[in-house]
């Protein structure tokens, strides 16, 4: 179901006129639907680490280089998933993004160790010390995509066509557009908002429960992964 069809269903639910072209720009009615649809998709993208938005990227280090613009690595980057950064084909783990306080402490007061530390600043990955050249550092990140083109299936950071299809659960998107439309038009939206929040938590929680367990590394702390296996029973 594309974004226009979802908005038309919302119009039916709220007993209002159906939008015919979200991008016409001439009808205020259609423009309001476009505005709330964009707000809803943007809000969902920022809500959390959706499994549908989780991707893997590889950074190839260059000798003596400490700063790597993220756009050069992954143009659709929104945020890095902490504790998912590894040196490929190596047992060494790169410590996750550190706080400004940790950065200064490590830079000026700590003794060097085997870990590679970095921070995210100015839309770039900045290493505390330049890693060796030629290291392949892989990490998972959250994409900024909210929809994909209904024809080419290209992922996009915003809707630009009536036929664009939201990445997120269509029912959640419908509920979100519904309460936002009611609010925008000065109507009571309490019931719709509560239903939306309940469904959103349910869908997001389902994604968390089905996250992959990485079996490629030498050691796995299953307690940290949120999954505990009894060694004796295997359960």
Predicted regions and their residues:
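Glycine-enriched, solvent-exposed interface loops adjoining structured elements
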Residues: 1-235
């Amino acid at each position: 179901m594309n974004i226009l069809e979802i908005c038309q269903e919302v119009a039916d639910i709220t007993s209002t006129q159906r939008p015919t072209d979200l991008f016409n720009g001439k009808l205020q009615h259609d423009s309001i639907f476009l505005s709330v649809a964009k707000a809803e998709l943007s809000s969902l993208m920022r809500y959390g680490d959706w499994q549908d938005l989780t991707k893997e990227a590889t950074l190839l280090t260059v000798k003596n280089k400490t700063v790597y613009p993220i756009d050069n690595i992954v143009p659709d980057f929104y945020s890095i998933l902490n504790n998912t950064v590894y040196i490929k084909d190596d047992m060494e783990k790169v410590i996750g993004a550190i706080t400004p306080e940790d950065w200064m402490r490590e830079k000026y007061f700590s003794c060097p160790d085997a870990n590679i530390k970095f921070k995210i600043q100015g839309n770039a990955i900045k290493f505390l010390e330049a890693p060796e050249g030629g290291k392949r550092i892989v990490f998972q990140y959250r994409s900024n995509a909210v929809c994909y083109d209904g024809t080419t299936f290209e992922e996009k950071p915003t809707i630009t066509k009536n036929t664009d299809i939201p990445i997120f659960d269509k029912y959640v998107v419908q509920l979100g557009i519904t309460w936002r439309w009611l609010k925008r038009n000065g109507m009571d939206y309490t019931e719709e908002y509560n239903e939306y929040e309940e469904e959103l938590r349910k869908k997001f929680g389902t994604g968390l429960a089905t996250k992959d367990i990485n079996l490629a590394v030498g050691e796995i702390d299953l307690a940290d992964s949120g999954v505990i296996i009894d060694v004796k029973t295997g359960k």
